[in-house]
């Protein structure tokens, strides 16, 4: 990319900065949850909604981000995304109650939902096609560093300052990013078709109320009648969307996508698989601190091997799938992740702490292989006219399933535990043991979906589409 103009390189740096902010925030909060609970007077076993409120908002807003960027301009939307994310960070730091924090996290989620997809769109518009892959590699690299730094940085700030600083550090960075965006980013626009507002609202209502209903009386405090009402509203909204999208060329997501068998299998497997995987980044630091008595910084450091394993495996995942095929790889990694989850629980409860980094490294390797395989399986056979829509739907499902996974993990903790817990006590460890056992079972279930993938499905068919897969 050395032959690109200086202005273009600066614009790529701005996009990379946005990727870093968004990826850092998805991991930095996890380590701080027990300290937040103590400060806000809440049970640490009920803090999962801090993550769910952010991830669910991202899932809801993702379908609108690309259309808004084309309609209003990439600079205007990217600037708005950074401002909303920064304001959300400020309000998070100022929150005095859990409800205030949840609202602030939702505002952050609106900004986060627009930052990454609009950043990708910007790269497509400012970089020549032959340099697109190199440019995307450059801007996504900081996004890979964010999860590596997030847990340890979050633990460090919590231990030596306070949890408020995990949000306050975003403010000066956000201000600089917003100013740089206004000064350096071009405001590309495109002619757009009419936005499917009806479909967007139906999907948003369906996803939001079903997730709230899943949280149940343990998390939200809703009565059984209220939960039943939420389920009914959510199901009706999703059924109405299916009716709305049938034979509708302007639908948010065309039902023609599901005529491609591997897309249907991959999407179903991704949804079920990421429910299980979404539990792990939430549960691991909470378990290390509440169940085993680790300090926030120590718990954050323990997450680094998992990220390193994930990053290292990305280099060879194509060769692995080429050698063994999608079905074998996905079934093996799904069952393997379940076994590694049990291994982590066992070694931790036995006090073999020196083994934990190796187990977490292995967990990261297995999880990364499964993620990459799920993404390419889902998108590789789609025709060109449906590839963009399929990628957007996959991105939304990824975020939705992760929010459901965290919700289920919180529900399990509430089911097996109580409002008041003692750090590093036998009773608390029993609560976590039952939760980990349940999680291992849930993580293994998608193997039944992946077993239906045709045995002759191999990676070499998908290499040409890898650039379209969700990150």
Swiss-Prot record:
Q: Which PROSITE patterns match?
A: MFS
Is Chaperone a UniProt keyword of this protein? no
- Keyword vocabulary terms for this entry: Cell inner membrane, Cell membrane, Membrane, Transmembrane, Transmembrane helix, Transport
Q: By its UniProt entry, which Pfam families does this protein fall under? A: MFS_1
Which ranges make up the Cytoplasmic topological domains here?
Answer: 33-48, 98-101, 159-164, 218-224, 284-285, 363-395, 452-471
Instruction: Quote the NCBIfam families the UniProt record gives.
Output: efflux_EmrB, PRK10504.1
- Name the protein family: Belongs to the major facilitator superfamily. TCR/Tet family.
Spell out the protein name for this chain: Putative multidrug resistance protein MdtD
The top of its lineage is: Bacteria, Pseudomonadati, Pseudomonadota, Gammaproteobacteria, Enterobacterales
């Amino acid at each position: 990319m050395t032959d690109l103009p200086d202005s273009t390189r600066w614009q790529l740096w701005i996009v990379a900065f946005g990727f870093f902010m968004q990826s850092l925030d998805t991991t930095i909060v996890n380590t701080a949850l027990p300290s937040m609970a103590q400060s806000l007077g809440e049970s640490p076993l009920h803090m999962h909604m801090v993550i769910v409120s952010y991830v669910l908002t991202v899932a809801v807003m993702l379908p609108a981000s690309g259309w808004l960027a084309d309609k209003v301009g990439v600079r205007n939307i990217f600037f708005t995304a950074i401002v909303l994310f920064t304001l959300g960070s400020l309000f998070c730091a100022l929150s005095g109650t859990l409800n205030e924090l949840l609202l602030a996290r939702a505002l952050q989620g609106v900004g986060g939902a627009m930052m990454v997809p609009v950043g990708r769109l910007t790269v497509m518009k400012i970089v020549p096609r032959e340099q697109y892959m190199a440019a995307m590699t450059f801007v996504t690299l900081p996004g890979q560093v964010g999860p590596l730094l997030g847990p340890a940085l979050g633990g460090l700030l919590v231990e030596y300052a306070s949890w408020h600083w995990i949000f306050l550090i975003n403010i000066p960075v956000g201000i600089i990013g917003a100013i740089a965006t206004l000064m350096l980013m071009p405001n590309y626009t495109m002619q757009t078709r009419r936005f499917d507002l009806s479909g967007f609202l139906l999907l948003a209502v369906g996803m939001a109320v079903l997730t709230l209903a899943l949280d149940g009386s343990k998390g939200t405090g809703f009565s059984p009648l209220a939960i039943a009402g939420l389920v009914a509203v959510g199901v009706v909204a999703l059924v109405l969307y299916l009716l709305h999208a049938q034979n509708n060329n302007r639908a948010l997501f065309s039902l023609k996508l599901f005529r491609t068998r591997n897309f249907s299998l991959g999407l179903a497997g991704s949804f079920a698989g990421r429910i299980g995987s979404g539990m792990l980044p939430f549960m691991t630091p909470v378990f290390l601190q509440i169940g085993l008595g680790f300090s926030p910084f120590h718990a954050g450091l323990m997450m680094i091997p998992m990220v390193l394993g994930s990053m290292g495996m990305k280099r060879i995942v194509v060769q692995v799938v080429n050698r063994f095929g999608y079905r074998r790889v996905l079934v093996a990694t799904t069952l393997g992740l379940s076994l590694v989850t049990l291994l982590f629980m066992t070694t931790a409860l036995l006090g073999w702490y020196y083994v934990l980094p190796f187990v977490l490294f292995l967990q990261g390797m297995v999880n990364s292989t499964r993620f990459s395989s799920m993404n390419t399986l889902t998108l590789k056979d789609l025709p060109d006219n449906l590839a963009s829509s399929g990628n957007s739907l996959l991105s939304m499902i990824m975020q939705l399933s992760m929010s459901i996974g965290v919700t289920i993990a919180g529900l399990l903790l509430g089911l097996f535990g109580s409002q008041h817990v003692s750090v590093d006590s036998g009773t608390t460890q029993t609560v976590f043991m039952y939760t980990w056992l349940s999680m291992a079972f849930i993580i293994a279930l998608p193997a039944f979906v992946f077993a239906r993938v045709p045995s002759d499905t191999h990676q070499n068919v998908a290499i040409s589409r890898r650039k379209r897969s969700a990150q």
